[in-house]
Each structure stands twice: as structure tokens, then as C-alpha cells.
Amino acid sequence: MAAKFHLKKAKDGQFHFNLHAANGEIILTSELYKAKDSALGGIESVRKNSQRDGAFEVKPANNGKFHFVLKATNGQVVGQSQLYASQANAEAGVQSVKRATPEAGLSDES
């Protein structure tokens, strides 16, 4: 199974997507979008920006764990990760996203 973006509609009518790795694990979650077209644009932004140097920022969380965010060229966050036990694990997550996004499919579940 290849990596895939899953586009969903929330109960409040907004849209969001998750990037699932080939093993089915969620490796990136989007922000909420008011329109489906905006969410689809967000997916394209993730595809583009995930390949850009300096687009990812690994950060410590308040509980001592780590996560990363993916930013567009305008500085807006277009995706974030789950929490990882260590900075090294979060950095490995970044590499997973970089590898997965160029060929990831799309499952429209909205």
C-alpha cells in the first residue's frame, strides 16, 4: 500500500486531511479549511513544501515530547505531526513525510 492523503469533512462542515504512510500510520495532519477546494490546495502545498529545505520545524512540546510542523513559504503551518518520544524520532517522521508526499495518492472521504 502506498502513502495516501485522506480528505475528510468534519461535523462542523470544515475540511481537513491526514497523510497516511504506506503502513497506514498517520504521519501528518492538516489544519481545518472552510472549503474543500482550500483543503485540496493545502494538500498541494504539503506536496510542494515538504520537499523544500527549511520547511519543517521540530519543536519540543510542553510534556517533554517532540513534534514537527510543516510551513509554507509564507510561514503558515500547513501540517503537523503527532507527538514523538524523542527529537530523533520526530526528525525521522520528517523524513517519512518527505519520502511519502511526492507519490501519495488521494482518498476523498468527504
From Swiss-Prot:
Name of the molecule in the record: UPF0339 protein PA0329
Sequence repeats: 10-58, 61-109
Annotated family: Belongs to the UPF0339 family. Duplicated subfamily.
Gene3D superfamilies: 2.30.29.80
Superkingdom of the organism of origin: Bacteria
Entry keyword set: Repeat
Region span, Disordered: 91-110
Transmembrane segments: none
Entries under InterPro entries matching the protein: DUF1508, UPF0339_domain, YegP-like_sf
